[in-house]
């Protein structure tokens, strides 16, 4: 189990995934 800090904020997800860029 990973300890998540109360002040930890996940990075905002990009609107368009660059990985699926063709």
Swiss-Prot record:
Entry annotated with the keyword Secreted: yes
Glycosylation sites: 7
Tissues showing expression: Hemolymph.
Keywords: Antibiotic, Antimicrobial, Glycoprotein, Immunity, Innate immunity, Pyrrolidone carboxylic acid, Secreted
Assigned protein family: Belongs to the lebocin family.
Function: Has antibacterial activity, preferentially against Gram-negative bacteria.
Organism in which the protein naturally occurs: Heliothis virescens
Subcellular location: Secreted
Main location, first listed in the record: secreted
Region (Disordered): 1-22
PTM-bearing positions, type Pyrrolidone carboxylic acid: 1
Quaternary structure and partners: Monomer.
Induction: By bacterial infection.
A cellular component annotation (GO) from this entry: extracellular region
GO terms for biological process, alphabetical: defense response to bacterium; innate immune response
Name of protein: Heliocin
